[in-house]
Amino acid sequence: MEDFVRQCFNPMIVELAEKAMKEYGEDPKIETNKFAAICTHLEVCFMYSDFHFIDERGESIIVESGDPNALLKHRFEIIEGRDRTMAWTVVNSICNTTGVEKPKFLPDLYDYKGNRFIEIGVTRREVHIYYLEKANKIKSEKTHIHIFSFTGEEMATKADYTLDEESRARIKTRLFTIRQEMASRGLWDSFVSPREAKRQLKKDLKSQEQCAGLPTKVSHRTSPALKTLEPMWMDSNRTAALKASFLKCPKK
């Protein structure tokens, strides 16, 4: 699974996931399923914000150019992927600036158009079950919840899906691709089932050989989705972004 993750996700996403796990004392080489889940969640968060801007009239627009107009403001502030101290600093700054209620838990995004924090969920289970778990944990009507599954299902607070259908379809397609590629390598069952995951972990610890058929290089389709994770007050510099790829994992 670790080799699969490193080959199928952008290096910046992998690096952020490793830092997040190490911050909580977790080892990506051992807890490989969690490693894959964190990378997937990060990518969905970046894809959620990709191409979405607010123009000078305050209207939400989609710009797919690699060189966005400097007058445009990013619609979403990405909070997920930052270390906890910086993440809370950004949240506090948003709350002080907008007057929105401070959440009890760190959200994933802030929507400047909708004036709300957003919690993104990616589940291997039924979307409604995961949605209820999120809602029970957050216990706040102020934070918007949007859940995606690997089967193309989604669920959002008050059926408000925030994004246009095409943008959501990109996310669903990517998740379905990840599932198919995991399945083709015999990794999906262990990713879904804790019991199977434990069995797979024992097997992986016995053999550290690289997954057969996985190449050492990957090709990149550039996208403006992965922006440098700077504080919100440095927004003017964010257009000088890291180019990232949402890769379709290479076939065997």
From Swiss-Prot:
InterPro entries: PA/PA-X, PA/PA-X_sf. The keyword Transmembrane does not apply. The keyword Cell inner membrane does not apply. One of its GO terms (molecular function) is RNA binding. It is found in: Host cytoplasm; Host nucleus. The active site is at residues 80, 108. Gene3D superfamilies: Influenza RNA-dependent RNA polymerase subunit PA, endonuclease domain. Disulfide bonds: none annotated. GO terms for biological process: viral RNA genome replication; viral translational frameshifting. The record marks 195, 198-199 as: Important for efficient shutoff activity and nuclear localization. The record marks 202-203, 206 as: Important for efficient shutoff activity. Keywords: Decay of host mRNAs by virus, Eukaryotic host gene expression shutoff by virus, Host cytoplasm, Host gene expression shutoff by virus, Host mRNA suppression by virus, Host nucleus, Host-virus interaction. Belongs to the influenza viruses PA-X family. Plays a major role in the shutoff of the host protein expression by cleaving mRNAs probably via an endonuclease activity. This host shutoff allows the virus to escape from the host antiviral response. Hijacks host RNA splicing machinery to selectively target host RNAs containing introns for destruction. This may explain the preferential degradation of RNAs that have undergone co- or post-transcriptional processing. The probable endonuclease active site in the N-terminus and the basic amino acid cluster in the C-terminus are important for the shutoff activity. The C-terminus acts as a nuclear localization signal. The C-terminus is recruited to host protein complexes involved in nuclear Pol II RNA processing. This is Protein PA-X. It comes from Influenza A virus (strain A/Turkey/Ontario/6118/1968 H8N4).
